[in-house]
């Protein structure tokens, strides 16, 4: 028997593997959504809570309020307009805004998992779907839609489709401030990706599109408040996210772990402990990316670690782990 005849069956058996991996990701997406939905229904039935009681808390209140009334509430300008606009658009046919947001996050979580599958294979996509904070990809938070457009922006950039990458990054920049960090990381990728100098300049010029989106929002806030720092001021007054040195930020976070601190919210101790662990994970991912000379990925995670580490305390780092695709 010839070597070609022996090798042929091996090629035929190897072909279905990518399709099987993709099917596994789809099953993981469906399974995790179903599990979270079942848990939510169980809570609603056993504790006599409404859909809004389960899915309409914390930042969701602000997002839905902006979608309904615009920036009418104090400090609501701390939230970028892209997500509320999407919710309002989908709810125009008469769908309740909460359901519109949940529908969007369902679709966006699938799109984000698909991008991760392209970037890192089935293990990366499934790990993202199984992450403890993946619950925020079911409630109407920004994580799902941001990850969808940001991950696909990165995938398109690595495929050298910089026009598409810039358009997706522009959407990301309209959704949350993390879009600024995405643009910074894409700029590093544009400079370090192989090619002549003119090509690198052309890549950078594409990024003027998402930069313009951020500039437009800052300009809009200036027309409302006559302050160029309105967004930072809202973050500081509403969520205690003013600037602090790294050691002050760590000290403020550690103080929450002390016995008796915030006695009316004892669960905060465990949340902030997880925030510290998440910061350590982010630092480790940044260092590993630097060692591997993955400069764009190191920038993407590193600038976020710096931003969180120079805030009053570590807050929302647990959710930000969902954005760190190099992990």
Report residues per predicted region.
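Transmembrane-helix signature of polytopic, membrane-embedded enzymes
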Residues: 99-100, 116-131, 164, 295-299
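Transmembrane-helix motifs of polytopic, lipid-linked glycan transferases
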Residues: 89, 100-121, 281-285
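Membrane-lumen/periplasm interface segments of specific transmembrane helices
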Residues: 32-56, 183-188, 192, 199-285, ...
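Short hydrophobic/aromatic helix or loop-helix immediately within or flanking a transmembrane segment
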Residues: 57-95, 246-254, 308
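Short acidic/glycine- and proline-prone juxtamembrane loop motifs at membrane-interface regions
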Residues: 139-145, 317
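Start-transfer (signal-anchor) and selected internal transmembrane alpha helices
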Residues: 1-44, 202, 206
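Membrane-interface transmembrane helices that cradle and orient dolichyl/undecaprenyl
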Residues: 153-164, 194
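Loop-to-helix entry region of an early transmembrane alpha helix in multi-pass inner-membrane enzymes
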Residues: 81, 85, 93-111, 136, ...
């Amino acid at each position: 028997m010839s070597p070609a005849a022996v090798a042929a069956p091996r090629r035929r058996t190897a072909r279905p593997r990518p399709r099987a991996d993709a099917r596994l990701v789809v099953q993981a997406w469906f399974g995790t959504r179903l599990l979270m939905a079942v848990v939510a229904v169980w809570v609603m039935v056993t504790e006599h809570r409404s859909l809004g009681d389960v899915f309409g808390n914390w930042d969701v209140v602000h997002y839905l309020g902006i979608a309904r009334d615009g920036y009418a509430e104090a400090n609501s300008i701390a939230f970028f307009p892209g997500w509320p606009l999407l919710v309002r658009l989908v709810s125009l046919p008469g769908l309740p805004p909460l359901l519109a947001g949940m529908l969007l996050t369902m679709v966006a979580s699938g799109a984000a998992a698909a991008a991760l599958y392209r970037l890192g294979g089935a293990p990366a996509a499934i790990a993202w779907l199984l992450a403890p904070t993946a619950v925020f990809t079911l409630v109407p938070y920004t994580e799902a839609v941001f990850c969808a457009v940001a991950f696909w922006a990165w995938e398109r950039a690595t495929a050298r489709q910089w026009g598409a990458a810039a358009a997706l990054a522009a959407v990301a920049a309209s959704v949350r401030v993390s879009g600024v960090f995405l643009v910074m990381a894409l700029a590093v990728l544009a400079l370090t990706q192989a090619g002549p100098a003119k090509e690198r300049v052309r890549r950078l010029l594409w990024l003027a599109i998402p930069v313009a989106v951020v500039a437009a929002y800052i300009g809009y806030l200036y027309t409302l408040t006559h302050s160029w720092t309105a967004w930072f001021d809202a973050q500081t007054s509403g969520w205690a996210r003013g600037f602090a040195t790294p050691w002050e930020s760590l000290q403020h976070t550690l103080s929450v772990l002390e016995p008796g601190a915030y006695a009316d919210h004892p669960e905060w101790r465990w949340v902030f402990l997880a925030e510290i662990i998440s910061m350590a994970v982010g630092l480790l991912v940044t260092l590993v990316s630097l060692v591997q000379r993955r400069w764009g990925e190191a920038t993407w995670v590193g600038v976020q670690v710096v931003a969180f580490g120079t805030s009053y305390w570590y807050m929302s780092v647990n959710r930000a782990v969902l954005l760190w695709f190099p992990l």
